[in-house]
Amino acid sequence: MADFRTVTYGAEFHRLLQRVAGHAPDAELAAARLALAEGRVGDVARAVGTITAAAGLAPTDEEFALLAAAEPESVTDLSDTRPGQWPMPAVDFQPTAPADAGLFAPEAPPPLLDLTAVPYEFVAAVTDETDQRAVEAMSRVPGARALWRAWRLSDPRDTPARVFVLAADVPGADLPVVAALLQAETGAAVEAYAPGDELPAYQVQARGAAALLWADEEAYGIGIARVFDGVDPVTGPWFAPGHPVLDGAERDRVGRYLEGGRPVLMTTQRMADVVEPARGAVVPMSYRTDGVWVWTDTVTYYLRTHGLAPDPELLAHVRGREFRAPVVDDVAEHRTLAALFRPAAAGPVGVR
């Protein structure tokens, strides 16, 4: 580890290794990441050239020039590829190992998990020593912000592969070293990025179907806003005659806050307007969040169209923030989605 160092164009080569992830054996990619952290840029260029040629991938003109400058022979076999030819690897990810599926019975395993807000017994059941070493390493990884773990599934005949996704608030040139540090600690694949980076689809998919193992911000409860005052098993949802109403400037300010939430689950489905059924199925149902509360566009519709106030606790929260919506980071978005899909096996802790 003492030999790790930053290099010129380290951020660009790190990005290239992110782009080829999933198109090469993990051991081959791990060797290339180690080479980059050790400053062996020529070896990295050769590895990327070999991977892209074998997979039929086409680097951009800028990437081609970067490879050629580092190692001219690395681009020898890339002349037959078409610009922009870069399909997504045929892989799937899930937050727990396939062998752990029985822990969630009779439910199906959830699409993602937040293990920072569940009982220790559940965490212990879905993690192992490698995960624990990764979490312990966070105190030694510069700028560590969050750590996810996913299991990658490709061919059903293959053994599931562990993939860590690490968010570290460091300059791009330092990401190869950060990734290599955690890779050395765990022996597993590590996809490192800095918050705000635009990630390739492979890493986005891995993080979006992962278990959040650790975050530098303590876990907190996620509020899930109610829409209606009640639901009749026969006639459906309803609002009470005395449901609070918002008017004037506050109605508009609350509406803008709700509309400005980060989309987390989008749908084109519409439901009927229960206040004016003659309007038909016009009520939107997508989910949004500010990182602390999650609500549906249904809430905003009834506010904008009929003046009906949101869930009292959500409204108090919006007022407490003086109607200024915060930026929702990747960890907050993950925690929100995990609260929506929280399995019974994980218990009720951490949700309002």
Residue ranges and their predicted role:
Residues 136-140, 147-169, 174-178:
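Extended intrinsically disordered or low-complexity segments
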Residues 32, 41-45, 311:
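Solenoid-repeat scaffolds in large eukaryotic assemblies
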Residues 7-17, 28, 279-281:
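Repeat-mediated protein-protein interaction surfaces in helical alpha-solenoids
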Residues 4, 54-154:
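Long, charge-patterned amphipathic interaction tracts in eukaryotic proteins
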Residues 2-5, 17-21, 29-37, 49-50:
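Amphipathic alpha-helical repeat scaffolds
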